[in-house]
Every structure is written in structure tokens, then in C-alpha cells.
């Protein structure tokens, strides 16, 4: 019932095994430009002192072994170093994400570990048991999304990929008015108005498992790149035209002044349209991939609040134009 039920969050939970010492448990999150790498227990101690080479060794992705030359110093200090349990990276807008971490203790707060603009949508947890990464395609584009790693202190941890993050406002499926405006704003039918029944949204998650060792930043960034921009089979315009699977249409021709002018105008129009999603922030779980229908020359913005003139929703002319542009 759209009047009483609101979507606070929807996600997928994956559990994984942790084993070994806390200082050999690693957490990585893909940010704007690289990996945010942390440790459940970072071996940085003021008193008693642990040699810096031990801390450096951790961040180089190496396990600290029991026969390490600094193990006595580690064991002397380990009881006074925080054991971090939970890491969250949350993209609640298309322009900002936040990373927070906590010890998951009752009555204790989480702390901010950093900010960025557009996260890449991958998290990784690794220990002596191996590692796991979870990636969300179009992570920042389909905000509000988040990835949580919890239970790093435990034998069993979990990663939750939130397609709609519970840290955001609940999703309200009600119409903006209690009456229809079919004639005035070209939307739906007055008898039915706007109804959320039948709404669907496809989301892609990728899980990768690693046998041993701590996976390098470069490897994880390559995984993220592959998930965000997977390889696709694309034919040439000539092939699409030849097989006629999409009916009759013309290839690009510039053999007359008129055809040259038409092609130039089409190029200018598509170039403008392709830049609009980023300029206008046409992002969000239910908006990404869609485009606006009609521009308001007086407000100097798209008619976002005028029903059928707002989101295009694969209807009529823009869809045909964009598909034909792709094929040509």
C-alpha cells in the first residue's frame, strides 16, 4: 500500500569467514581515485613502541608472522590498540560519498574516515582465510547506495550491498497530488493517476573470492573497472543496416549540402543530450539511464515537474531518436 508502506532499504547480504590475528585482517574500499586501505588492528603504538617497519609491512599487504622479528613488541602493545569492526561507504547523492568506521560497541559512535565525490562501488575484506570483494555496478549513479562490512572482529563477517541505503530517506511511492492533471501537464489518466504497482529496477552485483594473501589495490581496481564497464559486443552501423533487424533507416551520408547540414545538426543535438545527465545530475536508482523530455526555455531548465514532459521513460520520440543514433 503506497499510502502506508515506504521502502526504507533494500539490499543483499553476503557472509564470509575471518580467521587469524586481528592485525592480519584487511579492509579495502574503492574511492574516487584509488583504494581506501585499512586494518582491523593497525600496528601503530606510541607506548609500548612497535617499529614502523611492522606497520609499513601491513600496508604493503603482508601478513605479520609469529616468527617476525617484531612479534614481541606487537604482543606487548596489542591490548592497547583499537580493534575496528565495521566500515561503511555511503553514496547518498551523486556528488558526495562518506566513509565511516566503528568498533561496533554499544553506546559508542562511529567516526568519519573520509569523504569523496563518486565512489567506485567495491569493498574487500581479507584475512588468513582468504578474501572476498563485492561490487555494485553503477554504484554512485544509482544512489542512494552503500556497502557495509561488518563483523571483522568475528569469525564470520558480512558484507551488505544496499541498493537503497537505509541511511537515506525512505522511498515514498505516493503521487505528488491527490488529483490528476492529465490535460494541464500531460500526465497519465485522471481516473488512475500515478501508481507504483509494476515498478521494476535491475541491479548488478559481482562477488569475487580470493584464496590466499591480501589482494593488491591494482587487482581490485581492475575488478571494479570490469564490473562498471563490462565488455559488450557491438557491431558496425553497416552490419545493423544490412541485416534489417530494426527496419529501414539510413546510414550517415554527407554527399550533398543538405545532408551535411542535417548530419551536423543531429551531431550537435546528440552531443548536447549526452552531456545533460552530468550537468543536470540525472542520477538516482529510479532515474539513472533516463532523460528528460522537454526543455523549458523560460525557466531555463527541463520541465521536471510537468508529467509526461519530464522523464522520458522510453516513450516515443527520444527513444527512437537515441536508438537510431546508436545504430548509425
Residue ranges and their predicted role:
Residues 188, 302-308:
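Active-site-adjacent structural elements in folded domains
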Residues 214-216, 255-258, 325-328:
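Structural helix-adjacent loops and short alpha-helical linkers that scaffold large soluble proteins
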Residues 309-326:
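Well-ordered alpha-helical segments within folded domains of soluble proteins
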Residues 238-241, 248-299:
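C-terminal catalytic/scaffold cores in eukaryotic proteins
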Residues 218, 222, 257, 317-320:
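Extracytoplasmic/secreted proteins, especially bacterial periplasmic and envelope-associated proteins
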Residues 1-242, 278-279, 285-297, 313:
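Beta-strand/loop-rich accessory regions of lumenal/periplasmic or secreted enzymes
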